[in-house]
A protein has these predicted regions:
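Structured beta-strand/loop patches that form or line metal/cofactor-binding pockets in enzymes
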Residues: 2-52, 56-61, 329-334
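Metal- or metallocofactor-binding catalytic centers and their adjacent structured scaffolds
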Residues: 5, 10, 44-121
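Conserved, mostly hydrophobic/aromatic
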Residues: 8, 48, 77, 110, ...
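Short Gly/Pro-enriched turn/cap motifs at secondary-structure boundaries
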Residues: 29-34, 101-102, 354
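Hydrophobic faces of well-ordered beta-strands that scaffold small-molecule active sites
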Residues: 53, 138-144, 167-169, 195-199, ...
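Metal-dependent enolase-superfamily TIM-barrel catalytic cores that perform enediolate-based chemistry
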Residues: 128-240
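Shared catalytic-loop signature of beta/alpha-barrel
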Residues: 219, 228-243, 250-347, 351
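Extended hydrophobic packing segments that form well-structured cores
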Residues: 356-373
Length: 373
């Protein structure tokens, strides 16, 4: 039986500003963010099936990605995808790589839109196509920006009151202040809660070691992205028994394989826009599972469309390996799509609707800023 034909006929690109819901978001190194520039893609097949995807970098100073680069990258890639079958996701990624080396953040929205079409074309949710859903009610994690210790403690408490059981606490300054931030954020820790302490590459080995020595004994947390370079992170790892996970340095097949080879961490923060979408995200999930790692399925930033994609990927990770899914919608003050992605008591499950299960708000998206056909 011949497979029914399906081909990409048109790609429309939308731009939306997503204001940060808490005013100013602060990361190590004096980085501040007030809003995030989202690129949203609508891919249409010759049969009228629409697929949606989003790529929203965390500003221009988090990793080597920026919003203008997403749209200029799509301009390079999109014309080469017209006429291809969106269900052949690996072949789509081959075509994207042939059109543009790297620039994974530009490929993400296109890749996710293909998966949305694939799901709709066969009447299945994306998580079933990615390997099949678990029955795990997945914990979402908060994002607590770097600030005064007691203020961070207060913001953890506010998220706890909303039902969150996981918290990502940002650090990356002077050792004594960072130690105080961690101690304050964990001061009211409840049974079953977990904490990721994320320096976003902001520590040197020296400041990390000093900070760890200043901490009260027995605090239970995982240290994420302590240092900016691979060598520094491995050096720190050799001298501490604190569990470490990589994020900014876990970007590609090669880097995650090297992570395993070097025994450099216990897990990864898997952000699909950083890694290139769900096709590559699926592969990175599998490498991590083969290594026995824990996986935090996340996004750099993003609205409802980005959140839907990571919920579907997270839903395929076995419970013992799934650390959390990042509630990316929590940090933006604009809703771009509707769908059954309600967080209840700090947990979420992927819907059973075909594709991603979202309906974009076209009035919010406005008119396309570019179209390819």
């Amino acid at each position: 039986v011949k497979m029914a034909e399906l081909s990409i006929e048109r790609i429309d690109v939308f731009q939306v500003d997503l204001p940060y819901s808490g005013g100013v978001y602060k990361l190590s190194g004096g980085r501040e963010y007030r809003s995030f520039d989202a690129t949203i893609v609508r891919m249409t097949t010759q049969k009228g099936i629409e697929g949606w995807g989003e790529s929203t970098p965390f500003g221009a100073t988090y990793i080597a990605a920026h919003a203008l680069g997403v749209r200029s990258g799509i301009a390079e890639i999109a014309p080469k995808l017209i006429g291809l079958d969106p269900r052949r996701v690996d072949r789509i990624n081959d075509a994207m790589d042939a059109a543009l080396i790297g620039h994974e953040h530009a490929k993400t929205a296109l890749d996710v839109a293909c998966w949305d079409i694939f799901g709709k074309s066969v009447g299945l949710p994306v998580c079933e196509l990615l390997g099949g859903r678990t029955d795990v009610n997945m914990p979402v994690i908060s994002s607590i920006y770097m600030g005064e210790p007691e203020d961070m403690r207060k913001r953890v408490a506010e998220h706890r009151a909303q039902g969150y059981i996981g918290h990502s606490v940002k650090i990356g300054g002077e050792p004594a202040t960072d130690a105080a931030r961690i101690a304050a954020a964990l001061a009211d820790k409840k049974p079953g809660e977990f904490f990721i302490v994320d320096a976003n590459g902001g520590l040197t080995v020296e400041t990390a070691l000093r900070m760890l020595r200043l901490l009260p004994h027995g605090l239970d947390f995982v240290l994420e992205a302590p240092c900016a370079t691979w060598r520094e992170c491995v050096s720190l790892r050799r001298r501490t028994d604190v569990p470490i996970i990589f994020d900014e340095l876990a970007l590609s097949d090669a880097s995650i394989i090297q992570l395993v080879a070097d025994d450099a961490a216990e897990g990864i923060g898997l952000k699909i826009s950083k890694n290139g979408g769900l096709t590559r995200g699926r592969r990175h999930r599998d490498i991590a599972l083969a290594a026995g790692y824990t996986v935090s399925v996340q996004e750099t930033a993003g609205s409802d469309i980005a959140f839907a994609a990571i919920v579907h990927l997270g839903q395929t990770v076995p419970e013992k390996n799934l650390r959390c899914v990042l509630e990316s919608r929590d940090i933006v003050a604009l809703k771009t799509a509707d769908g059954p992605f309600d967080v209840k008591e700090g947990r979420v499950m992927a819907p059973t609707l075909p594709g991603l299960g979202i309906t974009p708000r076209l009035d919010v998206l406005g008119e396309p800023v570019a179209s390819y056909f």
